[in-house]
Amino acid sequence: MNTSLQDLEQEILAAVRHEVVPALGCTEPICVALAAAIGRTHLSSAPEKIAVRVSGNLMKNAMGVTVPGTGMVGLSIAAAVGAIGGDAEAGLQTLKSISAEDVAAAKKMLADDAVSVSMADTDHIFYAEVTLTAGAEIARVCIADTHTNVVLIEKNGKTIYQKPVAAADEKNPVAVFTKITAKDVFDFATTVDLEKIRFIKEAATLNSALSQEGLRTDYGLHIGRSLQKNIGNGLLSDDLLNRIIIETGAASDARMGGASLPAMSNSGSGNQGIAATMPVVVVARHLKSSEEKTIRALFLSHALAIYIHAKLPTLSSLCAANTAAMGSAGACAWLFSERFEAVSDTICSMIGDVSGMICDGAANSCAMKVISSITSGYKSMLMALDNTRVTGFEGIVEHDLERSINNLCALARESMQHVDQQIIDIMVQKPMH
């Protein structure tokens, strides 16, 4: 490892630890559940009414996803069950201990029309505000910019916590990834002391358990189980690509379908964590890779996913499971070849293939997009292993990996922001019955 990377070692490790964390349930509704749980701690009795206001992008990512343990979709049930049974100290695992009684009480609040959800007029791409009323008491909690970043707590109109301006503008936890290149990420992952990155094994443990749950039970669109059945009836072969698709898709099915198991997330998203983890797990098993090589590949995958996502808005109209799959495809290329050129060629070909995939909100159909992304990754990896790739003469892809990634992310930051608004407009206007 070169000297400059050694100097940044602690920052890189801290950034990956910050971005790769367990999360129970899709993180947008869970963010609202967390705000409600925090608000409840400032009331002397259970809330009688809850009002939720969120940014358009958060609304988009919460309309169609099942809240774990409830069997219901949307922000209303997330807020109600968070207020009644959520753990205010558990972050993205705030719903880990909810009971059947909590869920029943939350559903009664919805039946009594005691929970309202509306769009907030805010400049924040990511914003959630939950106001709880119990008798004469009112508690209000605001989360902004990231899923657990509480910026304001009020009780009865008086501020009892406000994140200081200095803290609100504190250094971006992934800022280190703006100082380095993809080649630096590769060099770091393949040479850093193994014990310092061993923690990434938990991603394989958690997301593999989620995958097995998705293969045992019908969740969401149960794509993983459907494809598995088609191996049994001869319509699909039991090859490496289909094993990657089935095991990764099943984890996403369970994640989006409300399984009460945590995913190891990446950049605030369980699906991104799944897309960055499961292909590596399956390929490492296929190749009978050593523990060290598997750990390094997992770290490389997650670090590349963070590296690309650091150039994107927190939420956008670009499907970020796709960019996370670029990390895992690159890591799988390394497992096969141990060459950075194969990693680079794989990612460039993916950018030339599926970079236009839109995000139209978190939903069961995310599993299909995860599968499409990792299928592109597998094709691109095989091309790279055969020393071919989408070239710099084609579309937004350039000869250089860094410039190709920057071009993709520029689309998401700029022109696709207009696409995002139209997606939100369509989603909030369509009939839901």
Curated annotation (Swiss-Prot):
GO BP, sorted A to Z: L-cysteine catabolic process to pyruvate
Pfam families: SDH_alpha (PF03313)
GO MF annotations in UniProt: L-cysteine desulfhydrase activity
Family: Belongs to the UPF0597 family.
Identification of the protein by name: UPF0597 protein DNO_0106
